[in-house]
Regions:
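Membrane-embedded alpha-helical segments that form the functional core of polytopic membrane enzymes
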Residues: 47-107, 124, 219
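A feature for the membrane-embedded catalytic helix bundles of lipid/isoprenoid biosynthetic enzymes
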Residues: 2-37, 113-248
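Membrane-interface alpha-helices at helix entry/exit sites of multi-pass transporters
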Residues: 106-114
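Alpha-helical transmembrane segments of multipass membrane proteins
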Residues: 39, 59-67, 204-208
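Membrane interfacial helix-start motif at the N-side
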Residues: 37-48, 107-108, 190-193
Length: 248
């Protein structure tokens, strides 16, 4: 005789949050994600559905702002703040729901990565095109194609290379409790810098800078910071992997 599966609680969902996530993602977005995962379980939604909803919410929010240039920038910024953080909360919720319901799968993980990559390209791309003539005026005098490219590439490259490294070297823990590297000043600075490019800060920065009319100023500084992190990450990752291979 089969027994009914007990309904999930918030505690059940929170138990499966991403423990290796950056601090703000873990304590803000995964809190939102746990609530959304709980709601999804009550509605009978699948993790894949949450992944698609996350993609649609983020890209759709950017498209709405781009489609209504007459919208006051403060209103557009507030709309982006809600849409982008709801999208990220759903992105956190899909994995939480999958782990809580024991429905994780390679296909689900692949769908999540594809949606994340496409969203990372489409959201800044759409906003970048919409920003000309609406945001910081100095950007209108520069080569627009470069600015749109710059608005997405450094952070996207950093994220993608991080995923590649984690997939190829799963034994080298990046942020978790099993990190046995010496916690030097450089390690602490690198960890702090990594938290500064977290999705919570990025999405909040996009929304607030748009509301203030300084979107391109934020993008120029933030992506420049990500570019610097990318160089440091490539160098330190190579040295880290080379050192681990010598120990074998």
């Amino acid at each position: 005789m089969s027994h009914p599966v007990p309904a999930l609680t918030y505690a059940d969902c929170w138990k499966y949050h991403g423990r290796q996530a950056f601090w703000l993602t873990r304590h803000v977005s995964y809190r939102i994600g746990a609530v959304l995962a709980l709601l999804a379980s009550r509605l009978g939604l699948t993790p894949a559905t949450l992944t698609l909803l996350s993609f649609i919410t983020g890209v759709g929010g950017a498209f709405v702002v781009a489609s209504f240039p007459q919208m006051p920038e403060a209103v557009a910024g507030l709309f982006l703040l809600v849409a982008l953080h709801l999208s990220y909360g759903l992105d956190c919720a899909d994995g939480v729901l999958a782990r809580a319901t024991r429905t994780t799968s390679p296909s689900g993980a692949l769908l999540d990565k594809i949606a994340d990559l496409l969203g990372s390209m489409l959201i800044p791309g759409i906003l970048g095109i919409a920003a000309f003539g609406r945001q910081t005026s100095w950007a209108d005098d520069l080569w627009h194609a470069f600015l749109v490219w710059w608005s997405m590439t450094p952070r996207l490259a950093l994220t993608t290379i991080t995923w590649i490294k984690e997939g190829m070297t799963p034994g080298i823990d990046r942020k978790g409790a099993d990190d046995t590297r010496e916690h030097t000043l450089f390690w602490k600075l690198k960890k702090f810098a990594g938290n500064l490019q977290d999705d919570v800060i990025y999405r909040t920065g996009v929304a607030v800078s748009w509301a203030c009319g300084h979107y391109w100023d934020f993008i120029l500084v933030f992506q420049g910071f990500c570019c610097l992190l990318l160089v440091v990450y490539l160098i330190t990752s190579y040295l880290e992997i080379a050192a681990s291979e010598k120990q074998k």
